Amino acid sequence: MSIIKKFLNLFKSGSGEEEEARLRAQKERYESFLKALTEGDLDARWAAVRSVGDLGEPFIEPLIQGLKDEYWIIRRGSADTLGKIGAPAVAPLINALDNPGEEVRQETIRALQLIGEPSVAPLVHATKNGHPFIRRGAVQALGIMGEERAVATIIESLKVADAGVRHEGAVALGRIGDPRAVAPLIEGLNDPKEQVRLSAMATLCSIGEPAIDPLIRALIDTNEDVCRRAGLSLVTIGESSVEPLIRALGDQNPGIRRGATEVLGQIGNTRAITPIIGALDDQERLVRIEAVKALAALGVPAIAPLMQVFREGDTRMRTGAMEALWMLGQPATTPLIMVLKDDQSDVRKRAALLLGEIGDQKAVDHLTGLLSDENVAVRREAFEALEMIKKRTTA
């Protein structure tokens, strides 16, 4: 049936000459609107778009064409009018998602969003059965609508062959924010397409707290790229990740402890200093190495606690503290100078060694004073430190 016949059928009532005259008038009205929509100038098209909403279904196809108009105001007006028409416009709008033009797709999705509930089931169906562009648009629309009932369907879209659909699926899940998406999104961190990996990361970050513990477990994924992206996601989540990561320092799995230590250093929250210092005594060497790097990354606030370990810790912890202080460099010079007069000769010796490694000219006079220390090992270390600083100065 032609769209003119559809239009006229809406107005049939009674019979006779009056009826025929009325139908002719309506036909002329329809044809004038149709001509304005398809052939008129900007003002005529805009007036027609605003006028045809109450006339309904016969104008759906011309309005669908209006979504492709060169002028934004016509595209927006067509979308608004299609939204008013409602359920009869859903199927044509879903088919219109096949258009690759982003501006057209945006207004098409807007119309479906305005229609609301009647569009949900057809959109869910379209995520499974349409052309890739239609599937992408359907997933995108469900995400924009925040449709929680579609979460399971959108999760399935993360597994399809088309990378564009997978990307839109990850983005849509971020808009909805349902924790059920966390595990599939972590799998998405290993997607072969960078765009999908980035959107999966962004969505995990936007989901926030419900994603933290699964991301921490992902720090020991067999795929190093997944581990790295999980760590970056935790860093991006930031403050909310700190306490769970601190708890993870006590995990039985050394890979978890190592990853948590590294991420805490990258986040840079000073609450983590004391727990990370505790990790300097970890049984696993790789955990201790990450603790040293994390403490150095935490900067000046870590110096005072490190100096305490430097003076009082056991051998393994002192070694880690020394490495961290060396990595911190010149900011550690003054605290180390202060312990050159410590009662313990071993503390004086190690402080002299570090000052030589750091190479700060400020330490020269204080190290010179150690050349008369009562302990021969301290005197030797002070001499070597002065030689190292001298070489750096003259280099």
PLM region descriptions:
Residues 38, 68, 98, 128, ...:
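Asparagine/serine/threonine-enriched low-complexity, disordered tracts
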Residues 368-374:
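TPR/TPR-like (Sel1-like) alpha-helical repeat modules
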Residues 29-37:
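An edge-strand/N-cap motif at the start of beta-rich repeat modules
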Residues 1-5:
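Helical anchoring/docking segments at protein termini
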Residues 40-41, 70-71, 100-101, 130-131, ...:
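Short inter-helical turns and helix N-cap capping residues of alpha-solenoid HEAT/ARM repeat scaffolds
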Residues 6-25, 42-57, 65, 73-87, ...:
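Structural detector for internal amphipathic alpha-helices that build alpha-solenoid repeat scaffolds
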Residues 29-30, 60, 90, 120, ...:
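Core helices of alpha-solenoid repeat scaffolds
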